[in-house]
Each structure stands twice: as C-alpha cells, then as structure tokens.
Amino acid sequence: GSALTPERSQQILDSGLTRIRFSFDAFTPGTYSKVRVGSLPLDRVIRNVETFLELKEKGNYKLPVVGVSFCKVKQNEHEVEDFIKFWQPKVDLISIQKFMPPTTNKEKYKKYYASDQYNELPVTEFKCVQPFQRFVFRNEFMYPCCVSFNKDLKLGSIKNTNIYDAWHSPKMNEIREMHKNGKFYEMKTCKDCVNLIYPPSEKLKNSTQKEA
C-alpha cells in the first residue's frame, strides 16, 4: 500500500486484476515502525488503501477482490483483534498468517514466534493448497509453492520447460497426491516447512528427544 497513488490505484482497477492483498502486520504506528522498518507512516499507508477502496466503490468495480494480511509474530500478536475489527467492514478478506522463517534455522528466529504458534502435539497431517493454486518463479526456476529451501521441489527452468508441461508433470502430480493424502512428511521441504510454521513446544521437543 505504500506505493499506491490515486493514479496507480485507478490503473490497477482498470487493468482487470482479479485479486490484490495489502500487507500491514500491525495496527498501531509504534508497532508498524518496528515490523515494517523504513516504510511510510502507517496512517499514510492506510489512507492509500482507503483511497483505493473508495475508487473501487465509486467506479462500481466488482474486482479485484481486496484483502489485507497480518503476519503474526511475538512483537505484534497483541494487535491482531484490533486489526481485524478495523479492516473487517472495509475489505473482502483478512489473512492472519503464521511466521515463516527465511531459513531452516529455527533457533535463530525463535524470538519472532508468536506465543500460540507452538504446538503441544506433533503435526501428523497437513494438506497444503499451494501446489493446486500457483507456480512460483525464483531465479528462472519453477516451484509449486513459496518455499524453496531444498532442491526437491524444483520443477525445471522457465528457459527450457513449458509452463503447461511443468504444471501437469508427473512430479507436480506426485506432490499434489502426497498432500491430498496428508503425507507432507514424505518430502523433505514440505516436512521442514511444517516444522517451521508449526514448531513443537519445548515440552513436546523434550519428550520426543527422550523417546528417541
């Protein structure tokens, strides 16, 4: 939302875009300045998004579907409810997301985990929707999701692989089938991802280590 201007907002509305989401990750200016370091002041970003919504309403645009997102971490978790109450009457959807570290080093990013992100029970079944929804391109390579810690999810290079063929490839179908059956643990990246998003509590981690 910080890059929005009335002119850009109008261009987006006229472009035929079907979905757009604005990330805030905070409700108060103080918290916003801590989690969104270097951004414009929060009130200005909110005003930008509200202008976008006003233009959409005045122009009777049905699309795009407008959402706002909030990545919950220890530093902002106390503002989730206020964030939802503020935006609920204004937008089509609100996404409250769990923190995902940029690497598999959980200990390094432990200080960011929200208090309710830890699991008292091990995650035994998880079905990811991303392989059914999207492709992600990173450094010319195609992936079935936004997580690419390891090479096991790499589906080929855009330079020599047709997108249609990659989308319908045996590997892509295998990943989808795996998640349909809740067997995320059969693929290293998927297993690492679930363990990072749903980390075990210290109590669970200790009991698991004792059993081992």
Language model feature labels by segment:
Residues 128-131:
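Short, small/polar residue-rich loop motifs at catalytic or cofactor-binding pockets
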Residues 137-139:
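Short, acidic, Ser/Thr-enriched surface-loop or helix-capping motifs
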Residues 166, 209-212:
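Short microdomains enriched in Cys/His and/or Lys/Arg
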Residues 47-50, 54-65, 89-126, 142-201:
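C-terminal accessory region of radical SAM enzymes
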Residues 201-209:
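Short cysteine/histidine-rich zinc-coordinating motifs and their immediately flanking basic loops
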Residues 1-97:
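Radical SAM/AdoMet-radical enzyme domain recognition
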